[in-house]
Amino acid sequence: PKTMKIKNSIGAALLLAAWALPSHAQIGEQRQNFAVGFNGGININSVSFSPTVRQKSLMGINGGLTARYISEKYFSMICGAQVELNFSQHGWSEFDEDHPELEYIRKMNYVEIPLLAHLAFGRDRGVQFFVHAGPQIGFFISDTRKKNDAWNNYTSTPEQHDKNVENKFDYGITGGAGLELRTKAGNFLVEGRYYYALSDFYKSTKKDYFSRSAHGTIVAKITYLFD
């Protein structure tokens, strides 16, 4: 659809802008620093379906390894890049107000790699405010499905409830902001992000049931890094 093409074009432009900022900071002060560590947090998930599927938020977990490289300080802005290797749970939980007795939960497990521009403002030792933005790719590894007995009295939709993931490669854009406390004992980060998938996990041709099946995830996480 034209709307999706426009959204994808805007997303690509934002990614290019986010990565261009550090690359144009060559006239800044050299501040090379490499840090590694780990992260963990929660996902608040939903899935964008077309046709629409009534649902409520589904909570999952995320966590993994983080590496960050700081390259420049451009005026008051610290510029760098961050990459992560995470386990992350996505999916959806159906809720129909007309039939509240029905329960269907699908949890989908991924290995994800966010590639982020890191832009920060603040003190070398103290508190910094930072912004992250960039592309994210993911690989589907497994899922679980929970369907209660109330469905025995209703006809379910096989294309919605019984179909396996068809596109195991997931990609999209992610971004967010947070605070970092830099100490001699290490760096502690608290962050909120949003992930918007540009890919569908079901096939979406004209003959398929869904024309859209994409993840949307609010992420809250804590990260610890040491130099």
Predicted feature locations:
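Flexible, solvent-exposed loop segments that connect beta-strands
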Residues: 47-54, 89-109, 141-169, 201-220
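Residues that define the transmembrane beta-barrel architecture of outer-membrane proteins
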Residues: 32-34, 57-61, 107-113, 127, ...
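Short glycine/proline- and aromatic-enriched beta-strand/turn motifs that initiate or cap beta-hairpins
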Residues: 25-68, 227
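Bacterial Sec-dependent N-terminal signal peptides
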Residues: 1-31, 39, 222-227
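Short loop/turn motifs that connect adjacent beta-strands in outer-membrane beta-barrel proteins
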Residues: 26-33, 72-79, 122-128, 182-187
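Transmembrane beta-strands of outer-membrane beta-barrel proteins
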Residues: 34-40, 77-83, 111-113, 129-137, ...
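Transmembrane beta-strands of outer-membrane beta-barrel pores
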Residues: 42-46, 87-91, 112, 121, ...
